[in-house]
């Protein structure tokens, strides 16, 4: 998606790419600082590394949440706009649920990842909005 938008609109493409890079770095820093062990009781798959915050939850919320913002801002057709927003919101929730179901995260890891990403997105969007407005 970022590559396609980079070709069509460089600012939007770069904003998507930088969003993913920043949230991934932030997630890794928080994991190394907090060092919460993963659940050991029930695992369908084996994961390594620390548990909090959930990387999948943080990255999915930051990536799809930012796409939701872009869709809301740029897509004019209300049916398409709201259909995409609902579908992406469901996808974010399903990714979080899957991490708990697979036994690789506690519920608090997923919810914490979502909340950290939402907080990050508020700041990121407020900063990037100024850059995108300079089109």
PLM segments and residue spans:
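Hydrophobic alpha-helical bundle signature of multipass membrane enzymes
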Residues: 1-50, 66-73, 82-86
């Amino acid at each position: 998606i970022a590559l396609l938008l980079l070709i069509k609109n460089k600012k939007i493409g770069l904003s998507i790419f930088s969003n993913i890079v920043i949230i991934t770095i932030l997630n890794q820093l928080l994991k190394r600082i907090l060092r919460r062990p993963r659940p050991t009781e029930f695992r369908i798959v084996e994961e390594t590394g620390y548990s909090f915050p959930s990387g999948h939850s943080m990255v999915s919320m930051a990536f799809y949440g930012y796409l939701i913002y872009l869709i809301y801002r740029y897509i004019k057709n209300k049916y398409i706009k709201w259909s995409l927003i609902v579908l992406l919101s469901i996808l974010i929730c399903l990714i979080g649920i899957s991490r708990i179901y697979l036994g690789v995260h506690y519920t608090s890891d997923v919810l914490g990842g979502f909340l950290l990403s939402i907080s990050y997105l508020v700041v990121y969007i407020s900063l990037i909005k100024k850059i995108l407005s300079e089109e």
